[in-house]
Amino acid sequence: MKKHFVVGETIKRFLRIGTSLALSISTLSLLPSAPRLSSAAGTIKIMPLGDSITYGMADEGGYRKYLSYFLQQKGYTNVDLVGPEGKDSASFNYNGQSVKYDDNHAGYSGYTITNLPGGWFGQLNGILETMQGGDYIKKYSPDIILLQIGTNDVSNGHLDGSEERLHKLLDYLRENMPSNGKVFLTTIPDLGNSGWGGNSNGDIAKYNELIKKVANDYSSKNVIYADIHSVIDASKDLADGVHPNAGGYEKMGKYWLEQIEGYLKASDGPQQTQPTQPSQGDSGPELIYGDLDGDKTITSFDAVIMRKGLINDFKDNNVKKAADIDQNGKAEVADLVQLQSFIIGKIKEFTVAEKTVTEKPVFEKSYNFPAVNQLKSSKDIPDPFIFMDGSKVESTDDWWKRQSEISCMYEYYMYGKWIDGSDDETTYSISGNSMTINVKRKSTGKTASFKAVINLPKNVRHEGGAPVILGMHKGISESTATSNGYAVITYDSDGMFSAPGTAQDNNQHKGAFYDLYPYGRNWDEQTGDLMAWSWGISRILDALYNGAAKELNINPDSSIVTGVSRYGKAASVCGAFDTRIKMCAPSCSGAGGLALYRYSSVGKTYDFSSKGGSSSYTYKENEPLGSLQASGEQGWFNGRFMEFRNAEQFPMDQHMLGALCCDPDRYLFIIGSCESEDWVNAPSVWMAYLGMKHVWDYVGISDHLAINIHKSGHAVIAEDIEKMVQYFDYHVYGIQPKMNLEELQTSVFALPKNKDSFADTFASKWLY
């Protein structure tokens, strides 16, 4: 098939867009800000502020959902929960009924009172600096702040100095909130036997005495003492030794209602304002075919450039792309004929070859690669269209062959051998919301098992059963998914610091996977944890295909894999290697996931105000190769990975891992977080996305790739799930989305004020 486009109109349209864009950029700083909208008089704004307990770790929505619901039941219709996180409306199941609640908050997992040294990434992020960075107290102007903070200070050995840090935080809050506003400062609960940081309850008792003292010192400044410690029984009310379970959060919701109700009855609630947010820009100008000299007109000069390029080969890849007039992937004589015919007026439009997407062929695996010490270092981002032997991809079939080679490269150099399940016999058993996966290795007779947790939607609205999100851990906004008709099955492990049963999170290589496939001396016996965790997700999928899907009314053909942090890396790997998975959706995956090793954002400053964040945020430290090769993380990879002296030795970079998901029948949905996520390097994830896009464009399935960079939160947040399911519903089921899906083709890093010129240059030497 052939299709036509009118060249003149294309150029005119481009010029209109370019002029408009230039005008909007040049005048943006001169335009007055939009007037802020006032909420109804009498509205009382409440900001839940704190760490992961405020966030709701272990039971999405935490105490906030209960407080919101109890306020509704008491008839308080003039209360608005506020904060930069969450959304205006969410729902949960309470006493057999679906209950709506206000999900806005300012809770951040792992945060301390102020920035402190320590933690997994070398720095513990502070609530004070986060509020200052986004100017959130002035933006949301809360009448009441429910402040619970300090668990991470104590558990990380920072009890000393906590009183002074509390003073700094309270001074900032009181200076920036309404003068008659109240801060309810609460104690923190004890830790259970499995709590992080060991037995810290002695220090917690000391810290809680400080809370009482500080609240008393600030009593004249509208700071009120609260005592959550008295509400939570660590032996009964904790889900994981740190975070409350549903019953514990319910107790907290009731307690907070009791504490604030007197103020609610006495207050008329001052009139407040909400901030406005500018819209994001696009990701750059479009290519004009035939305009080889870049002057936005097509003349005989372009024909001269094309003739020289066809004779001597094109030196500039962007010129070569503009010369591919029929868009068949090659600049050739047929393109020159069309160009000359257009210039002399013989034709008024170019004829473009319709791209057809063919089914992927299967290639035999080959691991005949050079040793690490034979690889040449290069600062350039590797061209995905060049084979290891230097030959070029010249057709779609060539690409599928190259994709197979890249897959083998990742096994050989980074993650270890992919175990495809052909030697596994998988059975399952279901009890309530728990599923046990039993695996027998056929060749040895060895057996192993691990557990998963099932979350089912109340109503299945998709034909063929509910789509299923397969999570590397709990805490992936399950209730948002189920409210959209999606099932969620996760490993029975809490959050990003609790390892699944398939492999321990260390370099010991123990767990269900290694019981069946012991770590050995040969490279093909050295499968790392990321592959092992991925193997477990694949066995869950086996169980679904083997009968569990029918029992649960789930459609296993509509599966999505996700996870955060190290499990974001694992989700990237799982989606790359198990082609049965319909969509891969890794979050905050960083180096070793979907962030380029070769791109650093250290020292770069960005404006995140369009996301409700800081207008001047500077990245301080990215996750380096050395960290991944350290003792605590080297178990994620294979032995050969430890041989690399620097990232410039890699014959691939992580845009090529993402490119393993390029498939006519599959999708990649990348999730990132831009603020307070220096370590996982969201700007580099954006660069990797731009690199991947060359592959999807070449194959002709550009809309099978998407990205969502949320403001903050080292997590799969509700926003991500909402956008993910709309994207999936549209592409897989044809359900029209409420959002504009074009938003998922850009990010805050594409805005003119944030754009790095590297985005336009790093792929300029690539074939396509």
UniProtKB/Swiss-Prot annotation:
Active site: residue positions: S68, D240, H243, S565
Pathway in which this enzyme or protein is active: Glycan degradation; xylan degradation
Predominant cellular place of this UniProt entry's protein: secreted
Residues annotated as domain Dockerin: 285-352
Coiled-coil annotated spans: none
Top class in the EC scheme: hydrolase
InterPro entries according to UniProt: AB_hydrolase_fold, Dockerin_1_rpt, Dockerin_dom, Dockerin_dom_sf, Ester_Hydrolysis_Enzymes, GCE-like_dom, GDSL, SGNH_hydro_sf
One GO term of the biological process aspect: xylan catabolic process
Any one Pfam family match given in the protein's UniProt record, by short name: Dockerin_1
EC number from the UniProt entry: 3.1.1.72, 3.1.1.117
Disulfide bond residue pairs: none
Top-level taxonomic group: Bacteria
Ranges spanned by the short sequence motif GXSYXG catalytic site motif, renumbered to the chain: 563-568
Compartments (UniProt record): Secreted
Region (Acetylxylan esterase): 41-264
Annotated region (Glucuronoyl esterase), positions in chain: 353-768
GO cellular component terms given for this protein: extracellular region
Catalyzed reactions per annotation: Deacetylation of xylans and xylo-oligosaccharides; a 4-O-methyl-alpha-D-glucuronosyl ester derivative + H2O = 4-O-methyl-alpha-D-glucuronate derivative + an alcohol + H(+)
N-terminal signal peptide: 1-40
PROSITE patterns the record matches: DOCKERIN (PS51766)
Annotated stretches, region: Disordered: 267-289
Compositionally biased intervals (Low complexity): 267-283
Sites where the protein binds substrate: K569, E633, W679
Family: In the N-terminal section; belongs to the carbohydrate esterase 3 (CE3) family. In the C-terminal section; belongs to the carbohydrate esterase 15 (CE15) family.
Entry protein name: Multidomain esterase
Gene name per UniProt: cesA
